[in-house]
Regions:
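FAD cofactor-binding and catalytic pocket of flavoenzymes
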Residues: 94, 266-323
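A conserved beta-strand/loop element that lines the FAD pocket in flavoprotein oxidoreductases
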Residues: 202-214
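Rossmann-like flavin
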Residues: 87-174
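Conserved beta-strand-loop-beta-strand element in the redox core of flavoprotein oxidoreductases
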Residues: 216-241, 247
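N-terminal FAD cofactor-binding segment of flavoenzymes
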Residues: 37, 44-93, 101-104, 151-155
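Short hydrophobic core segments
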Residues: 16-19, 42, 241-254, 259
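N-terminal Rossmann-like FAD-binding beta1-loop-alpha1 element of flavoenzymes
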Residues: 15-41
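Extreme N-terminal leader/targeting segments of oxidoreductases
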Residues: 1-16, 34-35, 75
Length: 323
């Protein structure tokens, strides 16, 4: 793993260049590396191992998030977007829920848009493989005293209203219920790509260029040739070139189209962007909920699933909620 200050050359080369180390890029690059391919990952953010994670919200959001936690999307309404920017990407800061694409959505893609080969039957084996790789389970919530009390309250309320609840499939192994999912799991229980796919890729010979921001893809006649990236050398910005035979751009729904547009590779990139809104409701209870003992949304209300609405709890620390 190359970090800021490690870049001693102006030019690098590889067979496969993968831009992004989150949920998309890490899987693609790992599978290629394990097939014997020469793979280089590029990550704009820094490399922060599990041992560096602490319980300080301000410190960890500054390290793991783009713009220290909040990127405002200007429009009506004004939306606060949270993006991961570190080795492991958004998987390091998400809530470890891992959902299969619903069958009704896959059916819609096939029936309304003619997208063949992506039926539930086609994808089920792939879903199962990823779930095995990430130790996914959705059994129950912790029975330990004063743990996940927010989710217990959600279940109690749903029962009174006769609403359907489901346990969330979680990519976690031996969860210690520190409720630090959103600022980096300090125990390594959450199976982010930082602790799951990327170590496999490195073991297979892949390299990771961290603190390395791709600014442009150089291409001609429909073929991409090399990437121009910015790194820090002796406290100054320095440009390097990475040549490749094959390119995977996996910078997420925001950064991927942004890079494609900057590189004049696509006029339509980003025009069909959609994202789900999180609407927060804050509740006060007469008894303690112990936000430090639990994990993010192990249970959801699925009563309104067909209306594209889930309800879950997130007993985050006050300093994180303030964001």
């Amino acid at each position: 793993i190359l970090k800021s200050g490690d870049y001693i050359k102006d030019k690098y080369s590889c067979d496969y260049l993968v831009i992004g180390t989150g949920a998309g890029g890490s899987v693609a690059g790992t599978l290629l590396a394990e097939k014997g391919c020469d793979v280089v990952f590029i990550e704009e953010g820094g490399y922060f191992p599990t041992s560096s994670f602490n319980n300080k919200v301000g410190d960890m959001t500054a390290k793991l998030y783009r713009n220290r936690g909040i990127s405002p999307l200007i429009g009506k309404p004004l939306v606060a977007l949270a993006e991961g920017r570190c080795v492991g990407g958004g998987t390091v800061i998400n809530g470890e829920g891992l959902f299969r694409t619903p069958k009704r959505i896959l059916d819609e893609w096939q029936q309304d848009y003619g997208l063949m080969g992506y039926s539930y039957a086609n994808l089920e084996g792939h879903f199962q493989k990823v779930e095995r790789d990430l130790n996914v389970e959705s059994k129950s919530i912790s029975s330990e005293k004063n743990t996940n009390l927010d989710s217990q309250k959600l279940i109690e309320g749903a029962k009174k209203l006769n609403w359907r609840t489901e346990f969330v499939p979680r990519a976690a192994k031996n969860c210690q219920y520190t409720n630090s999912c959103s600022i980096g799991c300090p125990t390594g229980a959450k199976q982010s790509t930082l602790v799951s796919y990327l170590p496999r890729a490195i073991d297979a010979g892949a390299k990771i260029f961290s603190d390395c921001r791709v600014t442009k893809i150089i291409h001609s006649k429909g073929t991409a040739h090399y990437a121009i990236a910015e790194v820090i050398v002796k406290n100054k910005k320095h440009k390097i070139k990475i040549y490749f035979n094959y390119l995977v751009i996996a910078g997420g729904a925001i950064q991927t189209p942004h890079l494609l547009k900057k590189s004049n590779m696509s006029k339509n990139a980003g025009k069909k962007l959609e994202f789900h809104m999180n609407v927060k409701v804050i509740a006060r209870f007469p008894e303690s909920i112990y936000a430090d003992k639990g994990t993010m949304f192990p249970v959801q209300i699925h009563e309104f699933e067909n209306e594209d609405c889930y309800i879950n709890t997130s007993a985050v620390k006050p300093s994180y909620l303030a964001m």
